[in-house]
Design a protein with these regions (language model features):
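GG-anchored amphipathic helix commonly corresponding to the ABC/SMC/Rad50 NBD signature/C-loop
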Residues: 19-43, 59
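Short, small-residue-biased leader/transition segments that mark boundaries at the very start
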Residues: 1-6
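Walker B catalytic acidic pair
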Residues: 46-48
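Conserved D-loop-proximal element of ABC-family nucleotide-binding domains
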Residues: 53-54
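C-terminal lobe/lid and adjacent interdomain/linker elements of RecA-like ASCE P-loop ATPase modules
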Residues: 61-150
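Short, conserved, surface-exposed binding loops centered on an aromatic residue
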Residues: 18, 34-37, 68-70, 88
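Conserved P-loop NTPase mechanochemical-coupling segment
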Residues: 7-18
Length: 150
């Protein structure tokens, strides 16, 4: 009978096994994001951009920056290495903060608002060129591959 052909059976779908780490992270952040927005809370996330698509991180940031979706002024505080987020289209200058280690290893925290920045400046380009500091000291990595003895 036709009904036998289309008989449905429950299928177990192990979410953590079958989904990407980015999808799992997104779903694990969904409730804290909704809770923060609904109740005007602070949400603090380390390595926010890790494992997630850049468009998704921008969408989440937009939720917090919008008066419509964030009428209770919830705050999203996060660390990131995604320089694409350094944009006047996403953040005001006072919303962007940098960290830099001093010579003793203590971390200094400072805002982009402390710098005189032209209205048409590219925050990302200026940051990557070292204009705002907070750039890691990489050094000459080619020495790691020099296997010849002198």
């Amino acid at each position: 009978a036709a009904s036998d052909v289309y008989k449905r059976q429950a299928v177990t779908f192990p979410f953590r096994k079958n989904e990407s780490e980015g999808t799992i992270k997104y779903f694990s952040l969904a409730y804290p994001i909704i809770d923060a927005l609904d109740n005007g809370k602070r949400l603090i996330i380390d390595e926010f951009d890790s494992k997630m698509h850049p468009l998704l991180t921008c969408r989440i940031i937009t939720l917090f920056n919008s008066k419509e979706t964030n009428p209770k002024n919830a705050q999203l505080i996060f660390t990131t290495h995604d320089t694409n987020l350094l944009s006047a289209n996403i953040f005001r200058r006072d919303q962007i903060w940098f960290t830099q280690k001093d010579r003793y290893g203590a971390t200094e925290l400072y805002s982009l608002a402390e710098y005189k920045v032209r209205n048409d400046a590219s925050f990302e380009k200026d940051y990557l060129s070292g204009k705002y500091g907070a750039i890691p000291i990489v050094g000459d990595l080619t020495r790691l591959f020099n296997t010849q003895e002198k």
